[in-house]
Amino acid sequence: MLYTLLLVPSLFLLVMPVPSQGWSRPLWYQVGLDLQPWGCQPNSPDIWGCQPNSLDSCKNSLGCPGYWLGLGGNRIYPVAGVTITTTMLLVVSRVIVHRWRAKVAKGQLPAVTSSSGKHWKEQPTVSDRTLVLRVLHMLDAILLHIEGHLQGLASQQQIQIKGSPPQSG
């Protein structure tokens, strides 16, 4: 129950509006993930592709704040949502597994055997390092999927992706 109360502020972050004037780029630029397709006007004076003082010309571009989907009209970036959700799931699952192991150690749960007849306690436990590597692998797969999706959107809207060669007509 205590862990649930600690996660409530994280949930609050999901519904907060993102300050459009405070961040000139999406959240993954803040943490160094380069997934954002380049945006608004190719000859714009701003290096990010948006007008410095006016985001009105950027409403339909992937490269500008405010394009990304939100909850209840408040803007949220998908990578931030995935990161927070994954972190919450990891914390909650860790607490549940810890409680379950404590009950098993006290003998409150019946012993479970696998189909091979081997007792479940005889199976090797998975280390924390292995679990972290598996989670990082899943997050990497999610980011690759998001990047592919963004590249597909960019090619549909004729927007050049940073780092990719320009597409000729």
Curated annotation (Swiss-Prot):
Q: What is its main location?
A: membrane
InterPro entries, alphabetically? Answer: TMEM89 (IPR028069)
Name its species: Mus musculus
Record PANTHER family? TRANSMEMBRANE PROTEIN 89
Keywords, alphabetical: Membrane, Signal, Transmembrane, Transmembrane helix
Transmembrane stretches, start-end? 76-96
Instruction: Give ranges for the Cytoplasmic compartment.
Output: 97-169
Task: Report the subcellular localization.
Answer: Membrane
Enumerate the Extracellular topological stretches: 23-75
S-S bridge residues: none
- Pfam families per the record? TMEM89
User: Which protein are we looking at?
Assistant: Transmembrane protein 89
- Please give, as recorded in its UniProt entry, the membrane topology of this protein: Single-pass type I membrane protein
- Give the CC-aspect GO terms: membrane
> Which region is the signal sequence?
1-22
